[in-house]
Amino acid sequence: MIEQNVDGICILANYSEQFLLSDEERETLTRLCIEHVDGRVPVITTVSHFSTDIALSRAKLVKSLGGDMLMMMPPYHGALMKGSPQQTFEQFAKVGEAGVTIMVQDAPLSGVDLPVPLLVKMAKEIEMVKCFKIECAQAAAKLRQLVNEGREIIEGPFDGEEGITLFADLEAGATGNMSSAMLPDLIRPVVLDFLDGKVEEAESKYNQILPLINYENRQCGFRAAKIIMKEGGVIKSDYCRHPIAPLEDSTREGLIKLASKYNPVALTWGL
């Protein structure tokens, strides 16, 4: 990923299949990734858990290893156990005691509503809460409201969800994007051009790669990056642990065929 020219790397997130890893595997990967990157780019480590104590212990491990940032979803477990706004605030405040910058992940997977006033309150009152990855429905509207109401305390408004809403989110005030590992080398120029005021160039570049982003987001999910990395010799296997099913053959072939038109780094890196 460093040779994809990324500005940072996020580990143990939902697209990292964190929900299929044991506690021991999580700790091993946290150590391995932070040590292997060795300061070349910042590493963001996801520490989400319904238990505040467990999330805090994960944060302390990251701190001890020299990790640069944490990412957290609000506390949830299954479809019905969800932290209240106050409980969510308290969990982020407690994890903030570890002394590592926090990115709040507002993702639909949690099913927890994070209204903008709560996010602004967290940014104002919890020292370590500085960044926000917004990938809920109508993300652009929420980003715009967050930036307008939070102003300078919202240090890092990020787009997510593989960049499927990237251009609208940039127009709304996002200053960064967290994509999958499949094509960050193709997404980065869009963001940089936009932030440099080259809006038409950014829009053109985004429109060119949007079919591949759409195919990943709507047809494949997190399996896309693994398939492309295996095809490109980056990894040996694209196996997904049960109960995740393998991608249907025709969809897999369609992904590889489409990706070959764009030639992302991941498709050739290990060949």
Regions found by a protein language model. Name each.
Residues 80-81, 142, 227:
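Flexible glycine/acidic-rich beta-alpha junction loops that bind and position SAM and/or redox cofactors
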Residues 1, 33, 62, 95, ...:
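Conserved, mostly hydrophobic/aromatic
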Residues 3, 35-39, 64, 97, ...:
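Secondary-structure boundary motif
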Residues 4-6, 171-174, 182, 186-271:
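C-terminal alpha-helical cap/extension of soluble enzyme domains
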Residues 108-219:
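Catalytic alpha/beta core domains of metabolic enzymes, predominantly
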Residues 2-111, 268-270:
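Active-site beta->alpha loop and helix N-cap motifs at the rims of alpha/beta catalytic domains
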